[in-house]
Curated annotation (Swiss-Prot):
This is Beta-lactamase hydrolase-like protein. Its cofactor is Zn(2+). Induction: Repressed by BigR. GO terms for molecular function: hydrolase activity; metal ion binding; sulfur dioxygenase activity. GO terms for biological process: glutathione metabolic process; hydrogen sulfide metabolic process. The lineage of its organism: Bacteria, Pseudomonadati, Pseudomonadota, Alphaproteobacteria, Hyphomicrobiales. Substrate binds at D309. Its EC number is 3.-.-.-. It is an enzyme of class 3 (hydrolase). The gene is blh. It comes from Agrobacterium fabrum (strain C58 / ATCC 33970) (Agrobacterium tumefaciens (strain C58)).
């Protein structure tokens, strides 16, 4: 095992064996970062064994699996976070060390602590070829639009600020309004973090976009509209969702015309974010109103495709359809192979760090719900999987807010807001 000390906080290495972990702890390492996907070669210990061995040796452990071409800023920031959390020296590895060092160096470059022109020499000094790191930075600087993700670990949701570097115009996609179902408390921590980012970067919010009425969190669209004055928008088929849930909530006087938003997008509609053109794909299946927003070389695919190691979204909500979901996914996969895809949720399989960015090509090659699958195969798999899933714990809480455009129910005489729960209207009980 080749191990190279980069500085007093970080050592980069090739694959250690499980028997090495007690020795690493004895040498003073406090944390292990495994940057290697499972199954790369026979005999590789893998995430589960490494996590167990690290814990037994008294070390923290982080799993940030990457291959060179698929490194994203989420991986880089996750590496930095594990470094910051470590209570002492960190031992980071992949198969040979290059990917682990690449994650470190890219973080240093993004934060201005190393110049792009110095990266390859830095690598040579330590015995590594970091040409791929400089190429990554070149691609990243050329990518339009600029995208900043905000991950909410309470709901596994990913929110986005999508900005035009030429004008500073931006859109906010799928923002979360905080809600604690145990206490009934609401908050704006997620939305305020987005507003802080917008302010620090001198951006102007032009749109607040929801991809569909969410069943697992409240939308912060109305709160952000009040703070920014930006227009709110969603797919036009939201009126069908409103009618469906109007009946379930027994709201005879509820408006089901979509007037809670400033704009209802039809399939194929185009709009501007700064000087960038955005267009709308109709993407039903998860819900009957879901849409995808395509901006430059990026598509915001919400609850259709998850990361390639996580498959696809469920299609068993009222108005959902596995067959429609397959068709919607095929429309997304018809985009160019290098189109960046940004998902709406990440459930961190294997305990890995959260991720949200892939490409059309990666999904086609690596997603087990898609690679080598026919429509019939997919529908069979998706429906069988959905039969095992309980309803989301917030579905009855969230939809009565989200079909109102993110507005809480009107306060009652005492000034308090109240949610309404219909009983026995959904299948999927957990007993």
């Amino acid at each position: 095992m080749k191990a190279v000390r980069i500085n007093e906080r970080l050592t980069i290495a090739g694959q250690p064996m499980i028997a090495d972990f007690p020795s690493l702890s004895a040498q003073g390492f406090k944390s292990i970062i495994n940057a290697r996907p499972d199954g790369e070669e026979p005999g590789q210990p893998g995430n589960t064994q490494e996590k167990s061995a690290a814990g037994a040796a008294g070390m923290d452990y982080g799993f940030i699996p990457v291959s060179g071409p698929t490194i994203t800023e989420a991986d880089i920031r996750a590496f930095q976070q594990k470094m910051a959390e470590a209570e002492g020296p960190v031992f980071a590895h992949c198969k040979g060390g290059t990917r682990a060092l690449t994650l470190y160096v890219l973080g240093e470059a993004l934060d201005g602590r190393i110049q792009r022109s110095d990266i390859e020499d830095f690598g040579k000094t330590h015995g590594f070829d970091l040409c791929a790191a400089t190429r990554w930075l070149e691609r990243q600087s050329a990518a339009v639009p600029h995208i900043k993700a905000f991950f909410d670990p309470r709901t596994w949701s990913v929110q986005y600020v999508v900005s035009d570097p030429a004008t500073g115009g931006c859109a906010i996609i799928d923002p979360v309004y905080d809600f604690d179902e145990k206490s009934g408390a609401t908050g704006t921590m997620n939305a305020d973090a987005i507003l802080d980012y917008v302010k620090r970067h001198g951006l102007s919010v032009e749109w607040i976009l929801d991809t569909h009425p969410h069943a697992d969190h409240f939308s912060a669209a109305d709160y952000l509209k009040q703070k920014t004055g930006a227009k709110t928008a969603i797919g036009a088929k939201v009126t069908g969702v409103q009618k469906l849930w109007q009946e379930k909530y027994n709201w005879s006087d509820f408006k089901t015309d979509g007037s809670q938003w400033d704009q209802l997008f039809e399939a194929g509609d185009r709009f501007s974010i700064g000087s960038l053109e955005a267009r709308v794909l109709f993407s039903p299946g998860h819900t009957l109103a879901s849409v995808t927003y395509v901006v430059g070389n990026a598509a915001f695919v919400h609850d259709t495709l998850f990361m390639p190691d996580s498959g696809t979204a469920r299609a068993d909500f009222p108005g959902g359809s596995a067959k429609q979901l397959w068709a919607s996914i095929q429309d997304i996969l018809a985009l160019p192979d290098d189109t960046r895809l940004f998902t709406g949720h990440d459930y961190q399989p294997g305990g890995r760090a959260p991720k949200w960015e892939s490409t059309v090509g990666e999904q086609t090659r690596s997603n087990p719900h898609l690679a080598g699958m026919t429509e019939e195969d997919f529908v069979r798999l998706r429906e069988a999987r959905d039969r095992t899933l309980p309803m989301p714990k917030l579905i009855l809480h969230a939809l009565q807010v989200n079909i109102r455009g993110g507005r809480l129910p009107e306060p009652e005489a005492n000034g308090k807001h109240y949610l309404k729960f219909p009983l026995d209207v959904l299948e999927g009980s957990t007993w």
